[in-house]
Amino acid sequence: MFEGFDFSKMGEVLEKAKEQAAALEAESLNKEFGAKSGGGLVSVKANGKGEILDITIDDSLLEDKESLQILLISAINDVLKMAEDDKKAIAGRMLGGLGDFGFKG
């Protein structure tokens, strides 16, 4: 089952993975994503961790609670999906950079 696997490299691979994860997490924190809804009446910004940084609402929506709620939900969902998609892309890059896990070819 473990034929061709070099266990002596496992520590090295894990250390590399840890370093890559820390670097990619720092990279993610510095990213900002933005989404708009209602033709720009509502805009939302979030960072790579999915934390909402800013919400801007056009004054014309302040008296239309139902529309405001719908547009806020839409913009927030969009920006959080962007952050999540970026996390998945970063994870894919990290896993791709781990090499052959010590398998001898």
From Swiss-Prot:
Keywords: Cytoplasm, DNA-binding. Its main location: cytoplasm. InterPro entries: YbaB-like_sf, YbaB/EbfC. It holds the Pfam family YbaB_DNA_bd. Gene3D superfamilies: Nucleoid-associated protein YbaB-like domain (3.30.1310.10). It is found in: Cytoplasm, Nucleoid. GO terms for molecular function: DNA binding. The keyword Oxidoreductase does not apply. It comes from the Bacteria. Signal peptide: none annotated. One of its GO terms (cellular component) is cytoplasm. The keyword Cytoplasm applies. Homodimer. Binds to DNA and alters its conformation. May be involved in regulation of gene expression, nucleoid organization and DNA protection. Belongs to the YbaB/EbfC family. This is Nucleoid-associated protein Ccur92_18190. It comes from Campylobacter curvus (strain 525.92).
